[in-house]
Amino acid sequence: MERKRIVSGIRSTGDLHIGHYLGVLKNWVELQKEYQCFYFIADWHALTSEYRDPSIIRKSAKDMVMVWLSVGIDPAQSVIFRQSDVKAHAELFLLLSMITPLSWLERNPTYKEMKEELKEKDLSTFGFLGYPVLQAADIVLYHADKVPIGEDQLPHLELTREIARRFNFIYGEGILKEPKEILTEAARVLGIDGRKMSKSYGNALFIYETGETLKQKVMNMLTDVKRMRKRDPGEPMDCNLYPLHEYFTPEEMRAEIRTGCRSAGLGCVECKQILLTNLIREFEPIWKKIDYYNEHAGI
């Protein structure tokens, strides 16, 4: 039986962080076992915010592919490509933009959110307003059956379906496929300062860090504000650190951390050292593979 088709991409705007690893890449690795997967470097999408310095996009694209390969994205199982190498993305974007009402774009619930997150950049451009149309083109171009997304991205996919539906109504039924969602669990991790983990905020733990840099970041992470001193009891669920333990620390050890935090038997520094050890254990094999691809980039 022919496998269902999936399309997904990541903007090449900088280094990938642990949120990408947990929320996207680990899902991609599993999905490629069951679906026909098309994974792409969204370099045209990256231009919506990085148009003043495209060198960032070029470097990020290369680094991104090395990370993808190192975490387990297999070119023998998945199609990996750069968006700008397939000109049909731009052609279909142009055609879809002709039939997409402006009001559909203006009501996009993440438009204001992204403008706030990237407020240091000038995003008063047609490209930024119209990026959901390019996103729709990316998906329907490949007749994708499904798209892996988090719950917060459902409005984007619904807009893609609306655009495809309108196109088919005008030009003929069945031309464009309306994709369905595969809901993936969003990574519940925060940055070192307690805000959403983001390259833009400068608070991210990146997938490819030196051990020393990672140590410095982990040791500077905010913890439960109630724990001003080691002898003060805390609550793991109120700590920025604990969600990372849920992903990288075995349950038996997590139980000890919860007990130790609530009884003040375990200090925050010790808790951070445990997390650091587990992060290094998880990512050290990935770092070695990235180093290999860096050394053999010409092959």
Ranges and model annotations:
Residues 2-137:
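N-terminal Rossmann-like or analogous alpha/beta NTP/dinucleotide-binding catalytic cores
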